C-alpha cells in the first residue's frame, strides 16, 4: 500500500477497499461544506492527514465539533477554549441539508437520518414528534453526525 492510500471499510459492508488520500480529503471537504459557516472554517484548519483519515464529523449541542478517526474521537479545534456547537446551528444544518423543507424529508428524518447532496448520510438525534403514536418528525435537534 502506497503512502497516499488508506484502507477503509466499504460503505455497504462489502469488505475493504483502497482509497487514495486526495479522494478522502475531497470527501471530507465536501462533508464539511454542509456545515454552518463557522464550522466550515474550523474544518478547513484541520491538518490534511486527519482530513484524509476522518470517518465522521460529530456535532453535539453544548460540545465542540469532533472528528471520528481510526484511533478515536478528537476535537476539530486545535486550541482551547474549544468553540461550542449550539442547537440553533444544528437546526440550521438540518434546514440547509433539506433546502429549508424538512417536511419533504420528514420520512427519513423521522427514522433519524437525512441524505445530503454527495450521498452523505447524516444521523440526527432530537425529540420525536408523534402523530397517532407514529414518529413523524424530529424537533429540538441535539446532535448530528455526518458519515464521510
Which role fits each region the language model picked out?
Residues 7, 13-78:
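N-terminal anchoring/assembly modules that precede and organize ATP-driven motor systems
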Residues 44-47, 95-98, 102, 129:
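Signal for well-folded cores of large energy- and translation-related assemblies
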Residues 57-59, 65-67, 93, 97, ...:
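Generic structural hydrophobic/aromatic packing signal, biased to beta-strands
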Residues 72-84, 123-125:
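Short amphipathic beta-strand/extended segments with alternating polar/hydrophobic composition
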Residues 81-109:
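A charged amphipathic helix-loop-strand protein-protein interaction module that recurs
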Residues 102-148:
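P-loop NTP-binding catalytic core
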Amino acid at each position: 500500500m502506497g503512502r497516499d492510500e488508506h484502507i477503509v471499510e466499504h460503505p455497504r459492508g462489502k469488505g475493504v477497499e483502497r482509497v487514495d488520500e486526495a479522494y478522502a480529503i475531497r470527501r471530507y471537504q465536501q462533508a464539511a461544506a454542509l456545515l454552518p459557516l463557522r464550522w466550515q472554517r474550523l474544518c478547513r484548519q484541520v491538518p490534511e492527514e486527519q482530513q484524509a483519515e476522518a470517518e465522521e464529523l460529530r456535532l453535539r449541542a453544548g460540545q465542540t465539533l469532533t472528528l471520528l478517526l481510526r484511533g478515536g474521537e478528537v476535537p476539530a479545534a486545535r486550541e482551547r477554549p474549544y468553540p461550542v456547537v449550539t442547537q440553533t446551528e444544528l437546526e440550521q444544518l438540518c434546514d440547509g441539508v433539506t433546502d429549508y423543507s424538512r417536511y419533504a424529508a420528514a420520512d427519513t428524518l423521522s427514522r433519524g437520518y437525512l441524505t445530503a447532496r454527495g450521498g452523505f448520510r447524516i444521523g440526527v438525534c432530537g425529540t420525536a414528534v408523534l402523530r397517532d403514536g407514529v414518529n413523524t418528525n424530529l424537533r429540538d435537534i441535539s446532535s448530528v453526525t455526518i458519515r464521510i
